[in-house]
Amino acid sequence: MKNSLLIYAPKISHFYKKNVWLKLEILNPTGSHKDRESVLLIKEAKKKNFKSIGCASTGNLAISLAFFSKIYQMKSNIWLREKDINIDNLKLIKSLGSKVFIKKISNLSKLYDLSSQLMKKRKIFNANPNSSNSKILANTEIIKEIYKANKKIDTFITCINNGSHILGLKKGLRKKHNLYGIFSKSKIATSINSFSRYEYENLIKHFNMKKDFIEAKEKEIFNGYKLLASEGLFCEPASAAVVGSLNKFKEKNICCIITGSVHKNLRSFQK
């Protein structure tokens, strides 16, 4: 996976009176940081002689895993929660060759548990959170790339759901630098409103859950959309929540990780 672009955001910087950079994971092949995870996970699966790989997902990992599995000639299995179904995403995942299982289940954590049990039984490589260190290491590469490109940044802000992404960033974080995670209860940002904490045991080891994880309100998500649009960027709600929440931080040299493209959320974006 090639380095994603790091850009300075002059209009967002002016609005917040801070220096703000954006790490554009949206430029990865399927438009999200999950591509980094998929490539490493598939390589690990092949090394261990698995013929098939699978995950439970709200969207981005499912699309990414389906895409790269076909390239690397592996079968892929995707578990989706019925309440999270995006028809466009579902069609895309199926068109990429994945076998899809849709479950009526109350939350994402339970879907992780169910799918993990089934994958173990069916000898499918498990790409769910807390199953392989490759998920963590893939995200560590993001912060390594930022440090290599920029010496001023000392604060990193990203979205959080199950924990793998932010744990990977934390692994590469330098001493005295700051890392914050944004979550939301808004129905607009479904990928970060379950806040499943599937990596909970690791999260409480490395973060102060009350200080380091910040809730974004719906108005902040909309503000994030507007600010990103002013820079010519259109991103998924989770990334808009990150940019729209910068007023909550005192730090002056900040990098926001723009984790996903709006292309998988175009219908909701129209609304």
Question: What is the predicted function of each stretch?
Answer:
Residues 1-271:
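PLP-dependent amino-acid enzyme catalytic core
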